[in-house]
């Protein structure tokens, strides 16, 4: 592997110890090619790792050989991009290396007057699992689609070590699979070219409603119905928004993103109709339209129970209301959902599986929730302790990526000390990945603190 930097957890070279975890930190596409060939020739358990934010544990595995792509940092703006093989151009675009994080991409776009369809966390790698898992954007998707809807071309290294271009003119089947089929499954994506949009202003506002002590359930359901109907009305106008519930104290928060405006008065007028419904509802409540830091229960067990309850009880009830309508997001899914093939891909799974067998004959790329996921069951297990150490390492990387945010320390300590937790999850068939707990804890606590150019209204009122 000349030209690649390799080491394992003991500090010894990979040529000396194959039974230990190996890491290769890549700076060139040629490094990716030789690393893949090395893993294939030595029958190593290969894992593709970018910034380590994957909540399903797909960016790590016990005893694995990890290919790190976060050093592939390059961006190039195109005034009018022409994909390879195309006879026409596709308009303004940006080519993004696999290691470019969203915060840097947004900052570069702000300097040049454009933006991309991306998520809220600035330390997530744009081209990694985020993009390949669909790429939902809370602010932009209602107007501009998912991140994958705006991909024009992908460069990737296949399981054979070949560098290929995938777009609407070359390797169309791989291009289709890489846009939503899941990261680390079909090939190692080294860069992607995506459509860009003018960097327009945006106003983000929140309407918070809390229930006074003693409010009956029926009245609270009426409040929630008003909020949800309001959200649907705004969504129909292509205004993005999210709805959050907090159990203690009982409250609900509606967040809305008004693109292409900086006029706070116009936003207030848009909200007035919804607020008037609360004023005339005769239901006791308190509301405000200011930004709030969302709080979540700190108990690890509580988070595990909530995840299991969502997958096993709440979602099946919702699906039963209309079996023909299902919407799932791979990047935020339960890694242990037994029905993941149907939940995330439905009728597309068989086509994706066929493409997996075409582009990765020997199943070199194996991940949780991925195609040929069954092969993972044949990989020797090193025990629950190794799994815990592996997933705790994900948390360590999250701490590193977020400048060792002290708010994660409590969660990390709890996960390391609650050893019986693993057996409890296994016995109930609802195994949850520690990195997901830490990541969700961090994300919920700082959800509205990163504001990439959007203003926040701050008026308050009480009834």
From Swiss-Prot:
The keyword Zinc-finger does not apply. Coiled coil: none annotated. Pathway: Alkaloid biosynthesis. Disruption phenotype: Abolishes the biosynthesis of communesins A and B and leads to the accumulation of 4-dimethylallyl tryptophan (4-DMAT). Keywords: FAD, Flavoprotein, Oxidoreductase. One of its GO terms (molecular function) is oxidoreductase activity. It is an enzyme of class 1 (oxidoreductase). It holds the Pfam family BBE. Residues 16-199 form the FAD-binding PCMH-type domain. Its cofactor is FAD. Its EC number is 1.-.-.-. PROSITE patterns: FAD_PCMH (PS51387). Belongs to the oxygen-dependent FAD-linked oxidoreductase family. FAD-linked oxidoreductase; part of the gene cluster that mediates the biosynthesis of communesins, a prominent class of indole alkaloids with great potential as pharmaceuticals. Communesins are biosynthesized by the coupling of tryptamine and aurantioclavine, two building blocks derived from L-tryptophan. This is Aurantioclavine synthase cnsA. The gene is cnsA.
């Amino acid at each position: 592997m000349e030209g690649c930097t390799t080491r394992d957890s003991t500090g010894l070279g990979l040529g000396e110890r194959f039974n230990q975890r190996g890491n290769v930190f890549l700076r060139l596409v040629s490094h990716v090619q030789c690393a893949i060939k090395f893993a294939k020739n030595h029958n190593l358990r290969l894992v593709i790792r970018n910034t380590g934010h994957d909540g399903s544990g797909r960016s790590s595995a016990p005893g694995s050989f990890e290919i790190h792509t976060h050093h592939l940092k390059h961006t190039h703006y195109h005034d009018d991009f022409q994909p390879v093989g195309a006879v026409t151009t596709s308009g303004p675009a940006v080519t993004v290396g696999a290691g470019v994080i969203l915060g840097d991409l947004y900052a570069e776009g702000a300097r040049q007057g454009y933006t991309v369809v991306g998520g809220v966390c600035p330390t997530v790698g744009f081209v990694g699992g985020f993009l390949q898992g669909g790429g939902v954007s809370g602010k932009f998707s209602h107007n501009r689609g998912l991140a994958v809807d705006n991909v024009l071309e992908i460069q990737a290294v296949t399981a054979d070590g070949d560098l290929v271009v995938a777009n609407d003119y070359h390797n169309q089947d791989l291009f289709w699979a890489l846009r939503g089929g899941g990261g680390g499954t079909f090939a190692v994506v080294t860069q992607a070219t995506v459509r860009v949009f003018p960097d327009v202003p945006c106003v983000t506002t929140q309407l918070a409603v809390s229930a006074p002590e003693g409010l009956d359930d029926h009245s609270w359901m009426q409040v929630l119905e008003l909020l949800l109907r309001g959200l649907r009305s705004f969504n129909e106008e292509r205004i993005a928004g999210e709805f959050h519930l907090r159990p203690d104290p009982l409250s609900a928060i509606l967040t809305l993103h008004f693109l292409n405006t900086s006029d706070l008065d116009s936003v207030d007028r848009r909200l007035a109709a919804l607020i008037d419904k609360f004023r005339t509802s005769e239901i006791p409540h308190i509301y405000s339209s200011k930004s709030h830091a969302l709080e979540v229960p700190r108990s690890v067990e509580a988070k595990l129970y909530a995840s299991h309850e969502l997958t096993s009880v709440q979602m099946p009830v919702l699906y039963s209301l209309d079996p023909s309508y299902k919407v799932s997001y791979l990047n935020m899914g339960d890694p242990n959902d037994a029905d993941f093939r149907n939940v995330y891909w439905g009728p597309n799974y068989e086509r994706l599986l066929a493409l997996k067998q075409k582009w990765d004959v020997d199943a070199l790329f194996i991940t949780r929730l991925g195609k040929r996921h069954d092969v993972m069951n044949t990989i020797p297990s090193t025990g629950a302790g190794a799994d815990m150490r592996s997933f705790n390492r994900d948390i360590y990387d999250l701490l590193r990526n977020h400048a060792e945010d002290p708010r994660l320390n409590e969660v990390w300590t709890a996960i390391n000390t609650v050893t019986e937790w693993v057996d409890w999850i296994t016995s109930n068939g609802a195994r949850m990945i520690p990195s997901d707990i830490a990541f969700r804890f961090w994300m919920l606590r700082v959800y509205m603190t990163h504001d990439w150019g959007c203003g926040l209204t701050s008026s308050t009122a009480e009834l």
